[in-house]
Regions:
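C-terminal accessory regions of radical SAM enzymes
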Residues: 236, 542-698
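Radical SAM enzyme [4Fe-4S]-AdoMet core and its adjacent flexible, acidic
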Residues: 2-19, 23-30, 39-50, 67-68, ...
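Glycine-rich, often proline-containing surface loops adjacent to acidic residues and nearby aromatics
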Residues: 304-308, 322, 364-373, 418-421, ...
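Flexible, acidic/Gly-rich N-terminal and inter-domain linker regions that tether
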Residues: 2-304
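N-terminal pre-triad scaffold of radical SAM enzymes
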Residues: 236, 292-331
Length: 698
């Protein structure tokens, strides 16, 4: 049966489908007096089935094993009863009285149907090529043509906005006596200044609608107004709004819209949002969820032994826009992150605090990697960012010098990698000006002399439509400063459409950007509208991304080249051509799990009454973790959305659900190996095994 038809079945129609397609299963259920007998008879049936040891047979046995158990669901911290097959028995014997969606029984139908079907054929290279090429990029001429008209419309609106501003002290104001044409030309010139976009950013639904040509629906406007009344921050620059397509024809901009327009679920839950990443919750004197002791405040986040995140008390606590699926929405809700720029300028106390934060890195035995983020690292002014990098440099010098007095086996890890986390290459590429490039170049030159070997801008392009001529120029400048750029994608519904991610990899690779992570959306209710089931991520990994896979030797050779060449873009283009690859599959598809970190190693152990899969995750065995990992072991997560609900959502976006029909089969995942570029270099000495700043007692 076609996916579209199955997704529309009623419960009674679905019951008839079971009787027609899976008569043996129905017979076992009818002959079983209760759920326990059903599971026992099902166990016997599976044991004698010719496919007992294939993936389908193993999956059914796992569902039998966990039925009737309770597991601790880590994200909500509650006990969760599992009764997947007990519910199926009730359904097949006419005892199911609940008014419910069909999603649970559709998924179970697919699992039992797998016992009788051969393994599906994977899509061909030509098929994936066709699916990839349907997605335009911001470098395409027809896209640029629409955006030129958008820009002109927005420029006119900005002239009117400036005319009505009551702040003559602003650097962006009109002198008396200017004609409209002169004002328009002046605004056109200011467009190239990132400060203009921050000053003119949209902060209200009404203004947003005006800059989008009054194209938003009444329903959307009502929702955004409700969000504003609840105190949700709203911030979108004129540049980013010019990327949206308001014409009703041309390119599909859903991947852009879903990032700046809030869903009903997000608005409804705002105010009660919890931190998904439990290690982000810091209490003075107490270890975080990963067992790390951290300085007071919320400036350092840490999960792994080798790396910690630094969030400065500067404008770096703001962003160039608020992403609807932001992992730090919890911090925006608590006002630790915000868009009130005047309040975010560094205070006199920041320099003193920065020295204390640097001491944490300096005195830690294992830290060798610092990720400066926020907010957004590049939102800090050039001078402020330069001061932060200077502090990092001085800390690294002191740590290296102190090691000279320590014997072999007791030396501390020295700083090897510096990263800046920023979405501004996509949100506001004008920020990448000559002053910033010079700061980055100078820091790399001097830091390279003290053992720091990797300098990375960790950016976030969500769709090839964000890769504009301005973004391409910003990327070129950053690469020219000697820093590598890698990309992290959030695999929301719009980005998960077939071929979309392969196209993004392709476009970014051509410009010299290496893809790093493809993140599943966190599974709390506020993200329900944009959540993509992990099964789709595994499907993408095994069916689409496989055409860019590198051999271990090729991956090593490429990482060596990227660490030495002056032109990463030319290097990657040559590599792709030589190895006949459409893109580089260097990113890992993962979910950021509460406390234990990134992983895609899971098994499905049950399904909720709503059809949401219950996944048992294990940690990523390819990297070092906090010792607390031995105590946590495997963890359980309920997904935010059923597979059936996800497919219906894709259909509503114009997708053919049949293109995704193998998604049901992906009930287990395995975390991919890291691209060798991201492995830490060996030290020319032996460091201590002792972990400092650890407390996992209790």
């Amino acid at each position: 049966m076609k996916q579209k038809k199955m997704l529309a079945l009623t419960l009674s129609q679905l019951e008839q489908l079971y009787r027609h397609e899976l008569p043996e299963l129905v017979s076992i259920a009818v002959q079983s007096d209760d759920a326990e007998a059903f599971k026992a008879n099902l166990t016997e049936y599976i044991a004698g089935h010719p496919e007992v040891d294939n993936e389908a047979g193993k999956q059914i046995r796992l569902l039998i094993e966990f039925d009737g158990q309770e597991v601790h669901e880590l994200s909500i911290g509650e006990q969760l009863p599992i009764s997947t097959l007990s519910m199926l028995h009730s359904f097949l014997t006419g005892q199911w009285e609940e008014e419910t969606e069909t999603d649970l029984f559709i998924d179970l139908f697919q699992q039992f149907k797998r016992l009788h079907q051969p393994a599906p054929t994977l899509p061909s290279a030509q098929k994936i090529k066709t699916l990839t090429e349907r997605w335009p990029s911001g470098l395409d001429e027809d896209v640029q043509h629409i955006r030129a008209k958008n820009k002109e419309r927005i420029l006119h609106a900005l002239v009117q906005k400036i005319e009505h501003r009551k702040n003559p002290a602003s650097r962006f104001h009109f002198e008396e006596g200017l004609s409209y044409e002169e004002k328009f030309n002046l605004v056109s010139e200011w467009w190239n200044d990132f400060r203009f976009h921050l000053a003119m950013a949209v902060k209200s639904p009404t203004e947003l609608n005006r800059l989008l040509g009054n194209s938003l629906s009444a329903e959307t406007m009502y929702l955004l107004s409700k969000a504003r009344k609840k105190g949700m921050p709203f911030f979108a620059t004129p540049y980013y709004l010019s990327l949206l397509n308001c014409t009703g024809s041309g390119y599909d901009d859903e991947a852009l819209r879903s990032y700046i327009l809030y869903s009903p679920q997000l608005v409804e839950t705002y105010g009660q949002i919890r931190a998904w990443e439990r290690e982000d919750i810091v209490e003075p004197g107490k270890p975080n969820a990963a067992g790390w002791l951290l300085p007071d405040g919320h400036n350092i986040h840490r999960r792994y032994p080798e790396v910690a995140i630094l969030i400065p008390d500067t404008m770096g606590r703001a962003c160039g826009g608020l992403c609807a699926s932001c992992q730090r929405m919890y911090d925006f809700q608590s006002k630790r992150l915000n868009f009130e720029f005047d309040t975010l300028r560094p205070k006199e106390t920041w320099e003193k605090k920065l020295r204390r934060l640097m001491a944490y890195f300096e005195e830690d035995t294992q830290l060798r990697d610092i990720l400066i983020t926020g907010g957004d690292a590049l939102m800090s002014q050039n001078k402020t960012l330069g001061n932060i990098l200077d502090a990092v440099y001085r800390m690294a010098v002191r740590k290296r010098k102190a090691n000279q007095e320590r014997p072999e086996g007791e030396k501390y890890a020295e700083l090897q990698r510096v990263r800046l986390g920023s979405r501004l290459p996509a949100y506001l590429p004008m920020r990448i000006n000559d002053g910033l490039v010079e700061i980055l170049r100078e820091f790399k030159e001097k830091a390279s002399t003290i053992g720091i070997r990797q300098f990375i801008i960790q950016t976030h392009f969500q769709t090839p439509l964000e890769v504009t001529p301005e973004a391409a120029e910003g990327i070129r400048k950053l690469l020219a400063a000697g820093w590598l750029i890698d990309n992290q994608l959030v695999y929301n519904v719009a980005a998960s459409r077939r071929g979309h991610t392969t196209r993004l990899r392709q476009v970014l690779n051509q410009l010299g950007v290496v893809c790093y992570y493809t993140f599943s959306v966190k599974g709390f209710e506020e993200n329900n509208a944009v959540f993509t089931p992990n099964s789709r991520s595994v499907q993408e990994q095994r069916e689409e991304k496989r055409f860019g896979k590198l051999t271990k030797e090729d991956a090593h050779n490429l990482s060596v080249l990227l660490g030495t060449v002056h032109d990463p873009a030319a290097c990657i283009r040559r590599f792709l051509k030589t190895h006949h690859l459409p893109f580089l599959a260097t990113d890992r598809n993962v979910l950021n799990l509460p406390a234990i970190g990134k992983s895609m190693t899971f098994n499905m152990v049950g399904i909720t009454p709503e059809g949401k899969r219950i996944l048992r995750f294990d940690h990523d065995s390819t990297r070092r973790h906090s010792p607390i990992i031995d105590r946590l072991g495997q963890i359980y997560i309920v997904e935010n959305k059923s597979i059936a609900s996800y497919l219906r959502q894709l259909q509503a976006m114009g997708e053919d659900a049949e293109e995704y029909d193998t998604i049901w089969n992906y009930t287990e995942g395995k975390t991919e190996s890291r691209f060798s570029l991201y492995e830490y270099p060996d030290f020319p000495f032996q460091i201590t095994d002792r972990m400092s700043n650890q407390d996992i007692a209790g």
